[in-house]
A protein has these predicted regions:
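A short glycine-rich, Lys/Arg-flanked "PGG" loop and its adjoining helix->strand segment in the class I
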Residues: 135-150
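A C-terminal cap/extension of S-adenosyl-L-methionine-dependent methyltransferases
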Residues: 209-258
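Acceptor-substrate binding/catalytic loop of class I
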Residues: 180-195
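Class I SAM-dependent methyltransferase SAM/SAH-binding core
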Residues: 63-110
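Conserved class I S-adenosyl-L-methionine
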Residues: 1-60, 63, 67, 95, 150-177
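A conserved beta-strand element that flanks and buttresses the S-adenosyl-L-methionine
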Residues: 123
């Protein structure tokens, strides 16, 4: 019997669009720059350059997995999408890291700490908003985290979505429940930070680092001045991603948790 229960989103049908739209331009560069900055700060404090065990869940095109493997870390990559994993393996092979990364093409629920062990860093970036049961995620990540390990989590920020619609005059959209186009890469479940913080607290975790991702880029209606210089634009995104109130308007929020 076919179940009518909601299932986690698999991007096998949209991998090329994901590759082009999400990481084919500045949006993806800004996202990676903020996450990489935050992780480097925490990793430098925790491991002092020593190799650590890393689990990249929902690892997508594998940019972070490959980069961390090149640094000598022990990386395990996971994604429910086989087509995404193929793209990630292409990138790893190009950088001579294919055989240095462990590959798991399965739902995250199949990742067992009894089989895989526990990890010093568990990464989960921009996937919680695609889950059927997002409230169960942080507990699962905590089970995979080593005692003194950290979790890197990003989520689609509902406050950003509200603010963007206010700027565009889409007032009617704010009066009804948000529904994303099934063929769109816009997540169907944005979250208020307060909701995510409740799950964090329920699992006895603390926030070591918080940042906004794309705190102004997504609100630009026309590029001008410093917007036309990619290096300067990313530099300003990095600068204000850590500063209130700007970071609270990031399209995504990044938490590093312990």
């Amino acid at each position: 019997m076919k179940s009518n229960a909601p299932v986690d989103r698999n991007f096998d049908d949209l991998t090329e669009k994901f590759k082009r739209k999400v990481y084919g331009g500045l949006k993806g560069e800004i996202r990676l720059a903020v996450i990489w900055r935050d992780l480097n700060q925490v990793m430098a404090l925790k491991v002092m350059g020593k190799p650590i065990r890393i689990l990249d869940i929902g690892g997508g095109l594998g940019q972070l997995s490959t980069k961390l493997s090149l640094m000598g870390h022990q990386v395990s990559y996971n994604d429910i999408s086989s087509s995404k994993m193929i793209e990630a393996q292409k990138l790893a092979k190009k950088n001579d890291q294919l055989n240095n990364i462990d590959w798991y093409n399965c739902p995250y629920q199949d990742l067992s700490p009894e089989i895989l062990g526990r990890f010093d860093l568990v990464m989960w970036h921009a996937v919680i908003e695609w889950l059927a049961d997002p409230d169960k995620l942080i507990e699962a990540l905590t089970q995979l985290k080593a005692k003194n390990g950290v979790i890197s989590l990003t989520f689609y920020n509902q406050n950003s979505l509200i603010y963007r619609n206010l700027l565009k005059g889409n007032f009617k959209l704010l009066e009804r429940e948000f529904n994303a186009d099934p063929g769109s890469l816009t997540p169907h479940t944005p979250f208020l930070p307060e909701s995510v913080l409740l799950w964090i607290k329920a699992n006895n975790l603390e926030i070591l680092k918080s940042s906004g991702i794309r705190v102004f880029f997504d609100y630009i209606s026309s590029l001008r001045g410093g917007h036309l210089n990619d290096v300067d634009l990313i530099s300003k995104e990095l600068e204000y991603s850590e500063v209130d109130p700007f970071k609270s308007l990031g399209r995504y929020i990044h938490y590093v948790l312990k």
